[in-house]
């Protein structure tokens, strides 16, 4: 199970590739892809299908034995995006000595210093010319070798570096791409890299620079995910937040059988930037799909509203593990430990969807699955983050709980999680769908 997770993390450096890999797994396990621009058609018990939005979010459904109005739906939500750096248009910046760096902007809230002095690569999607101007072609890009690096300033020029130095997002975190060897490469180095990679994987069509219309490209850690520790009990990887929760939900959905209740896996994009996009949790897209299912079953919108009242949502986004070097940052009585099981998250300011009722439901699921669970509340003097649970609940008023596995160094280029916690999470998710 952990080897599958590590392979998924390595193959999913950005949201677009994560969604492709999830879609491929769904197809391989009997789910069919649905085009949301076409009629949904008849919906029967046991039907398995999924839909994507913007190539960066994916929603999978297994229809229950009972109509959605009668049995509701059980939904696991997570997000496919992670903090990183986006490549700007006109990105190449030629400096002295022919060294080329790339102009970037920050996506989300990364711990920027953790991206320094490590091999990085590029991944994302490239938009190329198609037959219809309204329907350009999308190609995914993942350069599977070290390509870039953000280099620190030597300590001899920055004696205060170990005392904490403010970083400029425009100046300090621009990665080195290469060094031009001829004037012909000037201004074309990035495009040449993109074309070389796309053409090496192309099936028949040879692309040239004029075919490239635009791109959504991001930096990614080039070092593979791994386990570490005396007993290999820890996981070290980028994007544990939140791809580990996405993959746990996927594994649970695949492992489950048809039950009375419809099963939903909703993996959104753009949680790290507020979720207010067509592919984010703030979009009505998921509610549209659920309503279409209800209408296909009963031909009445009333069925959708009944289904919502009978539904339960698990919003799965990683939680903060207790850090042995910084115990003062945590609540004195509610600080989850690595390996202690899934974490229920609470917040008096309603940043999380959990309440006493939904927390009791999730704790009961953990007990049935033979899995320990923990509770997290912020230290009252430390502002915490938020997640997608209540954003989704504001448009679909679902009963639900916010939870996640505990990790260290959230939003670092490489985060630390627990092998045992991933196994626990898949177990309780499978129990939920069952």
For the regions a language model picked out, list residue spans one by one:
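N-terminal hydrophobic/helix-forming segments and targeting peptides
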Residues: 1-434
């Amino acid at each position: 199970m952990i080897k599958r997770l590590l392979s998924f993390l390595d193959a999913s450096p950005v949201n677009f590739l994560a969604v492709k890999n999830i879609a491929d797994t769904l197809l391989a396990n009997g789910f069919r892809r649905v085009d949301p621009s076409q009629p949904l058609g008849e919906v029967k018990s046991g039907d398995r299908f999924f839909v994507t939005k913007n190539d960066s979010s994916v929603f999978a459904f297994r229809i229950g034995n009972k109509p959605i109005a009668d049995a509701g739906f059980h939904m696991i939500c997570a997000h496919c995006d992670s903090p990183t750096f986006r490549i700007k248009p006109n990105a190449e910046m030629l400096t002295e000595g022919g060294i080329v760096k790339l102009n970037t902007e920050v996506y989300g809230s990364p711990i920027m210093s953790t991206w320094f002095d490590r091999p990085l690569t590029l991944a994302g999607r490239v938009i190329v010319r198609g037959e219809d101007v309204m329907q350009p072609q999308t190609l995914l890009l993942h350069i599977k070798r070290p390509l870039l690096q953000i280099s620190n300033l030597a300590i001899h020029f920055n004696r205060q570096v170990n005392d904490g130095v403010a970083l400029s997002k425009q100046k300090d975190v621009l990665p080195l791409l290469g060094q031009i060897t001829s004037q012909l490469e000037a201004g074309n180095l990035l495009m040449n890299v993109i074309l070389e990679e796309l053409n090496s994987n192309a099936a028949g069509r040879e692309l040239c620079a004029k075919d490239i219309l635009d791109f959504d490209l991001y930096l990614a850690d080039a070092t593979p995910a791994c386990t570490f520790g005396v007993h290999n009990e820890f996981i070290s990887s980028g994007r544990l937040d939140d791809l580990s929760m996405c993959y746990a939900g996927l594994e649970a959905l695949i492992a489950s059988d048809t039950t009375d209740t419809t099963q939903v896996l909703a993996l959104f994009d753009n949680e790290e930037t507020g979720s207010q996009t067509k592919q984010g949790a703030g979009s009505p897209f998921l509610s549209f799909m659920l309503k279409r299912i209800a209408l296909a079953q009963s031909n009445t919108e009333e069925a959708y509203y009944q289904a919502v009242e009978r539904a339960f949502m698990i919003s799965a986004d990683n939680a903060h593990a207790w850090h042995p070097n910084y115990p003062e940052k945590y609540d004195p009585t509610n600080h989850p430990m690595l390996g202690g099981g899934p974490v229920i998250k609470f917040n008096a300011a309603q940043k999380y969807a959990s309440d006493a009722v939904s927390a009791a439901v999730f704790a009961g699921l953990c007990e049935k699955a033979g899995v320990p669970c923990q509770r997290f509340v912020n230290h009252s003097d430390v502002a915490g983050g938020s997640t997608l649970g209540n954003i989704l609940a504001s448009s679909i008023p679902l009963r639900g709980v916010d939870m996640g596995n505990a990790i260290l160094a959230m939003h670092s280029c490489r985060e630390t999680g627990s092998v045992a916690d991933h196994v626990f999470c898949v177990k309780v998710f499978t129990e939920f769908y069952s």
